[in-house]
Curated annotation (Swiss-Prot):
InterPro entries (alphabetical): Ribosomal_bL20, RIBOSOMAL_L20_CS, Ribosomal_protein_bL20_C
Record's protein name: Large ribosomal subunit protein bL20
CDD domains named in the record: Ribosomal_L20
Keyword match Ribonucleoprotein: yes
SUPFAM superfamilies: Ribosomal protein L20
Family membership: Belongs to the bacterial ribosomal protein bL20 family.
Keywords (A to Z) from UniProt: Ribonucleoprotein, Ribosomal protein, RNA-binding, rRNA-binding
Gene Ontology MF terms: rRNA binding; structural constituent of ribosome
One Pfam family matching this protein: Ribosomal_L20
GO biological process, one term: translation
Role according to the record: Binds directly to 23S ribosomal RNA and is necessary for the in vitro assembly process of the 50S ribosomal subunit. It is not involved in the protein synthesizing functions of that subunit.
Lineage: Bacteria, Pseudomonadati, Pseudomonadota, Alphaproteobacteria, Hyphomicrobiales
GO CC term, one of those recorded: ribosome
Keyword Ribonucleoprotein recorded: yes
């Protein structure tokens, strides 16, 4: 059986790892062992933080919507409840964008949410009306 020399393959793998470690500080950018460990860890952080980014942005959108809605005299929870009762299905990212860039349109959304909340309050029977005194 012929002898297999792996110099070319090993060199290519090392080169690939060092390319990924560009911009790292100290030995981790130019020694294979340290670079490989640093690159592996950086990939774990990247995987984790792709998940965290979704949470962080949702929280940011909610804060922005809450601030804009409170200026209109509602709370975030009541606003979202009113939108769902009014049958308006807009996600939080778009609501946040509308609140920032198109305040007139956002005010109309708040008004329709308030209207839906008032309408349902008027049509819902009171639980204590039939209670015996």
């Amino acid at each position: 059986m012929a002898r297999v020399k792996r110099g070319v393959t090993a060199h290519a793998k090392h080169k690939k790892v060092l390319k990924q470690a560009e911009g790292f500080y100290g030995r981790r950018k130019n020694t294979i062992r340290a670079a490989k460990a640093a690159v592996d860890r950086s990939k774990q952080y990247a995987y984790r933080d792709r998940k965290n980014r979704k949470r962080t942005f949702r929280a940011l959108w909610i804060q922005r919507i809450n601030a804009a809605v409170r200026a209109e005299g509602l709370t975030y929870g009541r606003f979202i409840d009113g939108l769902s009762k009014a049958g308006i299905e807009i996600d939080r990212k778009v609501l946040s964008d509308i609140a920032i860039h198109e305040s007139a349109a956002f005010s109309a959304l708040v008004a329709s949410a308030k209207k839906a909340l008032e309408y349902l309050k008027d049509t819902t029977p009171n639980a204590f009306e039939g209670a015996v005194k």
